[in-house]
UniProtKB/Swiss-Prot annotation:
Side of membrane Cytoplasmic, spans: 55-64, 126-146, 224-246, 313-380
Protein name per Swiss-Prot or TrEMBL: Apelin receptor
Gene assigned in the entry: APLNR
Gene3D superfamilies registered for this protein in UniProt: Rhodopsin 7-helix transmembrane proteins
Chain intervals with Low complexity compositional bias: 342-351
Transmembrane segments: 31-54, 65-86, 100-125, 147-164, 199-223, 247-270, 290-312
Amino acid sequence: MEEGGDFDNYYGADNQSECEYTDWKSSGALIPAIYMLVFLLGTTGNGLVLWTVFRSSREKRRSADIFIASLAVADLTFVVTLPLWATYTYRDYDWPFGTFFCKLSSYLIFVNMYASVFCLTGLSFDRYLAIVRPVANARLRLRVSGAVATAVLWVLAALLAMPVMVLRTTGDLENTTKVQCYMDYSMVATVSSEWAWEVGLGVSSTTVGFVVPFTIMLTCYFFIAQTIAGHFRKERIEGLRKRRRLLSIIVVLVVTFALCWMPYHLVKTLYMLGSLLHWPCDFDLFLMNIFPYCTCISYVNSCLNPFLYAFFDPRFRQACTSMLCCGQSRCAGTSHSSSGEKSASYSSGHSQGPGPNMGKGGEQMHEKSIPYSQETLVVD
C-alpha cells in the first residue's frame, strides 16, 4: 500500500502491497478545511466548558463536573494539533514539522481517543449512580471522587497510547521528496511479522477504545431509561413531556457517539484484517479511500461534545449568556445574582441548587430519591 494514505497517519499499514493504488487521490482542501473547522469550534466550545466549570467555587463542583471538564481538556488537547494534520493533508501527506511533532501529535490523537471515551464512560456511570442508585451508592460516590477517577483514566489513556509515541517516526517516501509520518514496526518486529503488530494494535485499540466503553455506556443508559420510564408512569400527564425530553437526549448522546466513532473503528478494523482475510483489491481500495472521511467524522466529535453535554443544560446556557454580555449593563444583574449558582454544576446528576430538600453541605435528602429531579437535562 502507498504510504501516503491517510491510514498511515495512524498505523503506516503496508499489508496489501500486491494491490495497485495508482488511482488514489488525496482530498485536496476539503479534509484540511474540516480539520480547521473542528479546530476553531473545538477550541472555542471546550474552552467555554472549562471556563464555566472552573469559574465556580470548588465546593459547588460535583464528580460529574470533573468528568465534563476532563472531557473538554482531552478534546482541547487534541484539537490544537489539527492545524498540523491539516497542513500535512493539504501538502498531499508531506510532513514538514519533524519527528518530534510527528510523535507528539500522533500520541495526542490516541490519548484523546482513549481519554474522551473513558471520560464519557465515567460520566455515564456517574449518571447511572445518580439516577438509578442514588442512595445505595452515595458513599461510593463520595469515597471515589471525580478527580481521583479521572486521574486514573488519564494515566490509563496515556499508557494505552504509548505504542504510538514509541513507534511513530518520519521517513522519506520512496521515489519522492515527501516526508511521511508513519508507524515503524521494524524496531519491534521482523518484516514478516509487522502485519501481526499492526493488526494487534489496531484491533486492541478498537476493543478498548470503543467496543467495551460503548457497551458500558449502553448498559448505563438502558438502566437510566428504565428507571426514568418507571418513575414517570406514576406521574401525571404533564410529566410525559419531561420523560420524552430526557429519553430523547439520552438517545442523542449515545447515537451521536456511535455515529462519530463507529465508521472510523469499523473501516480501520476491516482494513487491518485484510492481511488475514485477503480482501479483493477493489474493496481494499474502497476502505482506504473512505477512511480519511471516517477520520473527519470521528474528529467532529471533539467539537460536538460541548454542545451535547453542556449546551442542553439551561444553567450552562445562562452562564454562557452571562459571559457573552459580561460588559453590558442589561446583563450585569443576571451575572452577579445567578451566574455563580447556575453555572456551578451544570452537568447531570448534581445540579439542584440549595433548597428545602437539601441537607448539610448541600447533599440531596432522599424524599424517596426522585430520579429525574437529579438530572439537569429535564429542567424546564
